[in-house]
């Protein structure tokens, strides 16, 4: 007989960057593990230093980092942390990205543009990631950018069940804010047993990037409308869509989105909007930090934790969303 046999069991280790430690702690609590102590700081010139306080040799490592602002700093920190795990002889490295940065740059709209979402995936692979676990990617094709397994999680059950439990479903209409979100909105309709409406944007051909008319396809008069989107950044598009629904006789409008990016004028727009409630998950810390009465933040931590457990135990992540 040659070689050495081991009888040790698999070992999971859970790591977090500095971008959103609150979410990391929630996920760790759901898993019943602790976040591995990590020394991380910025040098005077902005370079990032990372060192783990425990050995990761032979462990199945899960590293969570959401790409919130300042996005470039947290992407770079995540890459450095992946590299550190690879050089620490981790058995496997699963990168958890609740919000995947640069996801809107997923194709070339014009010549001489980058496909930055692909670049992020390539950088993670080069750094040493074996698998990516992400929540509600902006487009499905991003799953194909990474040369390895990608587990795509959905916040739809969490968001839809929340809305369905608080409104009269007989008066509910699910609304897609544009043609690109119709497939997701249709799944909401299936889950809630509600009809579908679409806000169609028509642009002024003489003014670049100017939406002049919002046409509503579907009956929204006297209805409680729930606008569904994957992210809200500055809030301009979604608030304009809500205004169009009210103009067409909607009784009330609720806005839901997985990712509350909420940049620039978003706070004022949400505050001054006639929308009664904005519902986000905590993939990003932005929504909770605004502290507006009309903002509700639901925790995505249980969903992420269940997926992590399935990956670690060689189970099925897909089975978590089969009913969807």
Curated annotation (Swiss-Prot):
Cofactor: Mg(2+)
Enzyme Commission number(s) from the entry: 2.7.6.1
PANTHER family: RIBOSE-PHOSPHATE DIPHOSPHOKINASE FAMILY MEMBER, RIBOSE-PHOSPHATE PYROPHOSPHOKINASE 1, CHLOROPLASTIC
Record text on cofactor binding: Binds 2 Mg(2+) ions per subunit.
Keywords: ATP-binding, Cytoplasm, Kinase, Magnesium, Metal-binding, Nucleotide biosynthesis, Nucleotide-binding, Transferase
GO process annotations (BP): 5-phosphoribose 1-diphosphate biosynthetic process; purine nucleotide biosynthetic process; ribonucleoside monophosphate biosynthetic process
Residues that bind Mg(2+) 1: 138
Protein name from the UniProt record: Ribose-phosphate pyrophosphokinase
